[in-house]
Amino acid sequence: MLRLTRPLFRQALKSSTGITGLAVHPNPLPELIKTYESTLSALSTIPQSSVYRQGVEALTRHKLSIVKGVNGDIQQAETQLKEGQIEESLDIASDELSLVAKMAEWKAWEPLEDKPEPGQWEYPGTATPSS
């Protein structure tokens, strides 16, 4: 019984994150799981060949497995996620979910409409000789 209530008790003692504008979440782990699952669902609208989708999907699946594997221990989740406090992880996950929607809207995987000028992506001192 005590093992189950310990994380809740520890969280109840936390009155502030110490970060301006970031409130303590009353039940962060289920919300984090829901956000990660929503992100994975939203990624299905982006082609599998997209590098963005591949990267975000791998990272989100990894984070989701961590959160599901800690069995409600917020402290352990914070340690394994390495993103600071759990509220910060929740904020990062929410931002990524918003970005997935924007990337789908922008169709970032499609080729550029206007082809770049020759040398546009070359930095000074790295230019290749012209043919």
Describe each model-derived feature in a short phrase:
Residues 11-22, 41-45:
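Short, charged, low-complexity loops and linkers
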Residues 56-66:
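Amphipathic alpha-helical segments that form the core helices of the histone-fold
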Residues 25-57:
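Amphipathic, heptad-repeat alpha-helical segments
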Residues 2-16, 70-131:
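Mature, matrix/stroma-exposed regions of nuclear-encoded mitochondrial and chloroplast proteins
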Residues 54-58, 84-87:
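An alpha-helix initiation/capping motif
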